[in-house]
Amino acid sequence: TNSIVYASIDSWGPQAEWIRHGLNNDQFERNIEKLLSSGVKVGIMVTFCLLSIPNFHALITFVLKMKKKYPWMLTIDTPMMSDPKHLSALILDDIMLDNLQDLVYYVQTNTSDTDICMFNSGELTKFERVYDWCKTSRFTGEELKRNRIDFVNFIDEHDRRRNTNWHTAFPELEYFYKECKQ
């Protein structure tokens, strides 16, 4: 078949479910596998933002597993979220930048243009672009402070309106939330 289905997800597990309200990650995983096993190609679209970083390894591990099981059938694209600024990865701190560098290394070590069960160089280049953008374009000064305050306000308001709990979904970012709140 010549069909291709594009599916959007920005992280994995409870974090992906918090980001995309109404998402059931287990159902998403089953649906991707069902499409692939039926011969339908899938393109995973990640709008890469700050909240993608903590559990992104789990997402790319899933993608790699599916690439190995269904060669030629799955691609991943990682365009960067630039707006709203308070959710962009440009508000990250040094710890998250280091984590992002580790993620790039993981993708690099699992990239080959001769092994169809790995990431390809185009996918790697797009992800390296995310890291380079974060490293060279991070917000500073008042812009950083304002966007981090807006980040906290967004989290609090999102949880209030949707009856969700960001703190449960993102325990590894609790320190960052507290930093931003000061």
Which residue stretches match the model-derived regions?
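Radical SAM/AdoMet-radical enzyme domain recognition
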Residues: 1-83
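Sequence-level detector for tyrosine residue identity
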Residues: 6, 12, 70, 105-106, ...
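Flexible glycine/acidic-rich beta-alpha junction loops that bind and position SAM and/or redox cofactors
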Residues: 48-54, 70-103, 113, 117-133
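Radical SAM enzyme core and accessory elements
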Residues: 108-182
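Context-gated lysine
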Residues: 34, 41, 65-69, 85, ...
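Charged, low-complexity, helix-prone segments enriched in Lys/Glu/Asp/Gln
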Residues: 6-8, 45, 96-107, 182
